[in-house]
Amino acid sequence: MSRPRRRGRDIHGVLLLDKPQGMSSNDVLQKVKRIYNANRAGHTGALDPLATGMLPICLGEATKFSQYLLDSDKRYRVIARLGQRTDTSDADGQIVQERPVTFSAEQLASALETFRGDIEQIPSMYSALKYQGKKLYEYARQGIEVPREARPITVYELLFIRHEGNELELEVHCSKGTYIRTIIDDLGEKLGCGAHVTYLRRLTVSKYPVDRMVTLEHLQTLVAQAEQQGVPAAQLLDPLLMPMDSPASDYPVVNLPLTSSVYFKNGNPVRTTGAPLKGLVRVTEGEDDKFIGMGEIDDEGRVAPRRLVVEYPA
């Protein structure tokens, strides 16, 4: 029986997309997948339809390493509407309460301080977290509220940008699992007036360079240019991709000689020099430092394979 043919190109890398407002992260993902004609694609942490900004999209083998970006810290710019609380904690929801805005500058500064550092956060019912196998927002849309446990998060930096009338603008540098909508909702309750998000932009993810972000419009323009020039679209699109191992760029690198890497790629732990004492590592092979997967240092100090790059035939 013949092996089923994979649909699309074997293209591997990470595209830093500047997500437009009003589209779901999955809709954007599918558009990018079609533009690149990629056989596989996945994003690394959804943005709400209201939100814009950096959405790393992994293509091909890079999807295996997207989990490491989910664990990375992120930075956001957010504008909140004070005096109104909504059921979703953002402007897409229904207003459930309106109160006057009467706090002082000192009270605002004091309230903001309580959200800095290591804190606990109860996720919104309008989130993709699951309860008994079902997403929270699915319960919320049915008018059902289920118990949620507070989760530890870290807010590394919470910058006050401006407060004008009923608008408050902040910049937030936070750990994985942080819901900006929940921070704004909780802040509004602490200030006694209620609040919801009207604008949210993800500025950075991990250490990815902001100047490498591209829009859907730019991708579509490149496809049109390629057609006009009579060249494959891939010739203009592929240089936009970050390396497939970039989601794991925070991990140390272990380079294996070719004599050892063959065993590693076959699923065997191997001994090496210069490896850290424990933890995950990026594994490369040979003098050209070709990335071959993620490994973990075992109890005997060997590098054991955890996620391997599959080398497809041309």
UniProtKB/Swiss-Prot annotation:
Gene3D superfamilies: Pseudouridine synthase, PUA domain
Active site location: 48
Keyword line: Isomerase, tRNA processing
A biological process term (GO) from this entry: tRNA pseudouridine synthesis
Catalytic reaction(s) noted: uridine(55) in tRNA = pseudouridine(55) in tRNA
GO terms assigned for molecular function: pseudouridine synthase activity; RNA binding; tRNA pseudouridine(55) synthase activity
Signal peptide: none
Enzyme class: isomerase
Entry's EC annotation: 5.4.99.25
Lyase is among the record's keywords: no
Superkingdom of origin organism: Bacteria
Residues given in the record as substrate binding sites: 43, 76, 179, 200
Role noted for this protein: Responsible for synthesis of pseudouridine from uracil-55 in the psi GC loop of transfer RNAs.
The family this protein is said to belong to: Belongs to the pseudouridine synthase TruB family. Type 1 subfamily.
The protein's name: tRNA pseudouridine synthase B
Organism in which the protein naturally occurs: Salmonella typhimurium (strain LT2 / SGSC1412 / ATCC 700720)
Source lineage: Bacteria, Pseudomonadati, Pseudomonadota, Gammaproteobacteria, Enterobacterales
Gene that this sequence comes from: truB
